Amino acid sequence: MHDAESTVDSLLKEIDNEMEQTKSNITQNGSEDTPHNWKLPLQEIGDDTMEMLVKHNTRSNATENSRGRSPSKMSTISNESLNLGLLRVNSELEESPAAVHQERIKNSVANGALGHANSPKVLNNLKNMAQDIDKLARDEEKPVKLSSSPLKFTLKSTQPLLSYPESPIHRSSIEIETNYDDEDEEEEDAYTCLTQSPQILHSPSRIPITNAVSINKLNLDFTLNPNESDKSLVSDTSVDSTGRELDTKTIPELPFCMSSTPEMTPVDEKCNLPSKLLNTSNNSHSDSRSPTASVEDLNISTNLPGADSSQNNPVTTDADALIENDVVRDLQQNMEHIDDAFDEKKVLDEGCSNEPVTFLGENDTRSIVYSNKGTNANVQEFSQEDSLAHSEPKFKDLNATSDDVWNEDKETDANISTSTKSEESYIADYKVTRQEDWDTKKLHQESEHANEQPAIIPQKDSSEETFTELNNESEFQRNFKDGEEYRIVQHEESLYGQRTKSPEENIINGSEIGVDHGEAAEVNEPLAKTSAEEHDLSSSCEDQSVSEARNKDRIEEKEVETKDENIETEKDESEYHKVEENEEPEHVPLLPPLPRWEEIQFNEPFIDENDTSNDSIDLTRSMKPSDYISIWHIQEEEIKSNSPESIANSQFSQQSSITTASTVDSKKDNGSTSFKFKPRIVSRSRIYNPKSRVSSLNYYDNEDYILSNSEWNALDPMRRNTLISKRIQDNIRTQKGHAPLIRPSIMKLNGEDSGFQNHFLEVEQPQEHENIPLSTHLSEQDITTNVGLDEQKLPTNTQDEAEISIREIESAGDITFNRGDLLSLSFDEELGQDFANFLDALDHDSTSFNHGPDDSSSFQRDSSKKSFNSLWESSYELKPPPSIRKQPIAPDVLQKLLESDTKDDADLEKIREERITEPRTGLGIGMLKTPVKDVSIALAASIKGYEASFSDTDSRPEGMNNSDAITLNMFDDFEEDKMTPSTPVRSISPIKRHVSSPFKVVKAGNKQENNEINIKAEEEIEPMTQQETDGLKQDIPPLLAQTKDNVEAKEETITQLEEPQDVEQEFPDMGTLYLSIKAISTLALYGTKSHRATYAIVFDNGENVVQTPWESLPYDGNIRINKEFELPIDFKGKAETSSASSERDSYKKCVITLKCKYEKPRHELVEIVDKVPVGKSFFGKTKYKFEKKYVQKKPKQDEWDYLFAQDGSFARCEIEINEEFLKNVAFNTSHMHYNMINKWSRIADKIHGSKRLYELPRKAPHKVASLDVEACFLERTSAFEQFPKQFSLVNKIVSKYKLQQNIYKEGYLLQDGGDLKGKIENRFFKLHGSQLSGYHEISRKAKIDINLLKVTKVLRNEDIQADNGGQRNFTDWVLFNECFQLVFDDGERITFNAECSNEEKSDWYNKLQEVVELNVFHQPWVKKYCEKLAEEEKTRTTGHNLKQDFN
């Protein structure tokens, strides 16, 4: 690589030396103003060498030496991707060297870096520039018009490869206004400028004329180390390690003029510095440096003096060295900040627009700036004073801050690099003024951002904006004295920007703020300290200050408003964060204010006890809920309606229909409530669950007794007292441990007015009879055993006793009162009627109770009226939950439950006493005595879903407990009854099924026609024992038996019956025989015309007789019939008797009879010869002539009377249908001829009338006609075959079948579905008849065979419906936009798409649609019929060929 670089360097040096020598020769001869005569063809260099040459020149050449030239001005033009320094010499515009130098400092570029200069776009632009140069070189032969003051431009790096004419007639892409004599040429120039692109407008050449770097460093990083930064600041040469640069030469410059375009508006900017700032003389411009930035290096300043400047300008002071050292040291300390800023602005470079570019003119008095609002205004000429007064404020408002900072940075670096010790005072004063200007601009920008009304800022080139912001960021990082002020402003700006601006805008604003302070900080530089006393500013700077002060008042007002908004926003945000920090650790919600309660009123506490306004629900609603969720919601609403906390004005309670009124009233009273706490006796517990739910009975043995928080004890005072509640729990555990066998009892009420005389609850005999006061804490047994059977009632004057009694009885464990079963359990006067209504509803719903075992034996029933309706024979069974699964039950209790007879009271009492003394554990079942007569318990193997499993022996062995004999088997989750299809012993073998798929995957090399799977029938379930079937026929849910059927449906298979192997499948018949009677010929019957005969054909198959209509008998004796008859052929032994020896030779006999009708002629025409006299002579004989004539005479006898039978039968033909006949005509149309026989004719009597007709002898059977018949037999091969009614339809069906089989097409199709699960594959398909075969698209191996006979329909793309009616995904929309889909009869779908033209897709769809439509003609008999026809055709063709060969 180094060898290649060195070779290129040597080549470039040789080229430069040759151009230098040629240039010197031309200069000596005094022919600088004439066009050059030397050229260097670009074609010989090559593209790669040209690119390297351009890069080398644009980085290595940073100086230009013009000898013998007048002072010239430099105009800095910022192009799209490059900065071209063009020198234009104008002898007419003579200005002071100080003003020229001041303007150069203003327009210079400091530490600029173009990050995108080595991008492919820039290299492409460079190639275009080279092509333009070549084009301009070819135009040098044209006549030129020399001006009095020729304009020239100087290339800073190398001699031009091609010469350029100096005539103003020669035009380039960028033109500046000049004095032309020809107005037409001016118009042409303006038009040319308007038609050029923005990239060409600003440069006559596309070769970058900027500082360049050595070829050895073509690819540099975006960041530099401090050493390289020092070198770039100290030296103006390239960053090449050799420190050597190519000599720069000058060539004539083309005149150019910038005219306004719709994208450009002229803006003038000029700032004149004192003449002392310049080191150059009026006669030489050799000391000037190029103010443009280099292309490759991003962080190298190219306008600082270097080795060459020190040689050319030997007069340098110590102050210059000090200033340079300070700057270098300051930059070394902050270089890492520059790197960070660069990385930060990288994102901004990508998002910037490339359209707007700012052009700062140095020789010209105007600047061109792109604006967002383009106008077609002409170029406006301003004087230097007007441009300062008008254009400078407009430019400051329109352009971004980064542009100004860029210019200021260039100015600052120029001051550092070119000023002397005597000039430092001017620079310091100038910077003081610039600091004030930048403060004003900063406030103006902040106000604009705060009000979200940005000024019209022209967009800049991304490269320009990027390295400008980087330089400004570095300037800010070098500022330490003003850091505190920057942090305050940045904090205010970031707080507001986070809420109002996007992250990208915050980055931009942040960079601008940093630039402002960085620029303001220039006052504190050492350069400013050394010259603080000199305050002599140029006139242009004063004018600029005046113009910028015009907007000062407006900016200050906006600044005040912005600061106020920022302060308020900061306060709000700080308060918000404080509140957030305080709220995070506590998490305490704000509670609503408590309502003001009224005092408790005890007026009339026991009178209005039946008031249900605050109760849960109406009594009739308790049976309505059918599921647990509904019950739970009802309970929740009713608890809230009864609770004072929820009825009050609480925002946490749910507003139900009951609590709405009270809540509204409470809101009106400002927190007070109308709720009156009326203490009343709760005589009824509201129970809401209508369904029976059996809870665990032994839950308090394993865990602590937990009192339920149900709705009916929500207001229980004892429940609210924790100490009392714990005491009750301990007492319950103690009593259960001491007397676990004592059963709770309920008394019977025999009051006459109670309405409960006929309802008895069997209870135990209590041991004690005493009233327990409310203040005593009662245990469970104290409560449940203190009431006897001696007509003693519970006290009804306390609330707690009744409520505790019901609750503790329910939680006793041995007797379970489900809340859904007991609608009301009050012990007052209204209990009887409520409980009677409940029993009626209970009987209607076929629900029952779980009762204690001590009451089971006391079941009494009215023997006078018995009406049995077994509960377990209903359509459903109740299932207990798995909590009491397999719970043992005493055998004697179960025996009493199953007994149908009753026992007297003495036996019941005896049994009860025995049970009390006998220790046992288990489930108690209480019996409810009721007068309802239509409910009884009969003997059965299952009761309420409980199955009784009896032991094999009646007597159980010793040591076996009572609970071991009989257990409760429950069908809760059907775990014990997994009904798998199997073949049990002594069961019928299941019917085999044939499962066929609409498509089947074909293995490579083994393509099968059928893919059958034999499975067991799901209908055959393993039979159960007799004990199980007695009580569980209705217990098995239908969904269980249908589970596997549903699984099969999801597997997308079609099930068809298959013929068993051991049993012959029975068909309804053997098939259908079609007989077509074509004609009867050679009929031996004369005198048809005179008898006016008619005929009919009678068809008799032994079962049915069919007769054709009567028609006229033709005179010629040939009858054309053309009648078809359908004849089902039964099996041979179907009509046989029990004797197996007698077999018929034929299946059926078909008789065809010809019947005739005729009219007897009334008269008979007889020919007679009549003798007619002709004349008579007088003396002669009479003459006669003989005439023949026909006369009618009454016939003596008719010959037809002896030809017909009495029913008119004349001829008969019997067709014997046997195996041979069927074999000959099977699936084939055969033509046959049969003789029709007359066996009814008689011999006529010679003496007419001597004998009667039936006494005459018969003639022997003889042939009277010939019968032509076509027969075809369609044999049945499947019980599901359907045959047409007419033979003419057979031919049509066969023709349609042939048409289907002849359909053929092949091509590539995209397949989705079928054997491809979750993927799409392109395959080669062949459609042949009803078979669609898929092959691998490359290897053509068989992959899938699709049976189109199972396709029900073919859908187009618009008819295809996605699953669940949803929209199709994007992949399907792209790949299957114009597709078609096959829908099978089992729901399977396969989608196809053809990657071809629309005509080809339509052809695929039409042919598949035609095949599916012709599926109705596809039956087994059709296929066999066509095969037989094909065989006959082949035989006929073979015979014909043999005959031709023989001949």
Swiss-Prot record:
Domain of life: Eukaryota
SMART domains in alphabetical order: PH
Chain positions with Phosphothreonine modification: T365
Gene Ontology terms: biological process: axial cellular bud site selection; protein localization to bud neck; septin ring organization
Keyword set includes Cell cycle: yes
Residues of the PH domain: 1302-1413
Function: Required for establishment of the axial budding pattern in haploid cells. Cooperates with other bud site selection proteins to recognize a spatial landmark during mitosis and they subsequently become a landmark for downstream polarity establishment factors that coordinate axial budding and cytokinesis. Involved in the septin organization at the bud neck.
Organism for this UniProt entry: Saccharomyces cerevisiae (strain ATCC 204508 / S288c)
PROSITE patterns registered for this protein in UniProt: PH_DOMAIN
Note: Present with 1600 molecules/cell in log phase SD medium.
Modified residues (Phosphoserine): S10, S78, S81, S91, S96, S167, S367, S511, S616, S805, S811
InterPro entries named in the record: Bud4, PH-like_dom_sf, PH_domain
Compositional bias annotation for Basic and acidic residues: 1-16, 549-580
Main location: other
Segments of skewed composition (Polar residues): 22-32, 59-76, 277-316, 538-548, 648-664
Protein's UniProt name: Bud site selection protein 4
Subunit field text: Interacts with AXL1, AXL2, IQG1 and SEC3.
Induction notes from the record: Cell cycle-dependent with low levels at START and a peak in mitosis (at protein level).
An example Gene Ontology CC term for this record: cellular bud neck
Keyword Cell cycle assigned: yes
PTM annotation: Phosphorylated by CDC28.
Region (Interaction with IQG1): 768-879
PANTHER family to which the protein is assigned, alphabetical: BUD SITE SELECTION PROTEIN 4 (PTHR36100:SF1)
Localization of this protein: Bud neck
Region (Disordered): 1-38, 57-76, 272-316, 444-479, 529-591, 648-673
Keywords attached to this entry: Cell cycle, Cell division, Phosphoprotein
GO MF, one annotated term: GTP binding
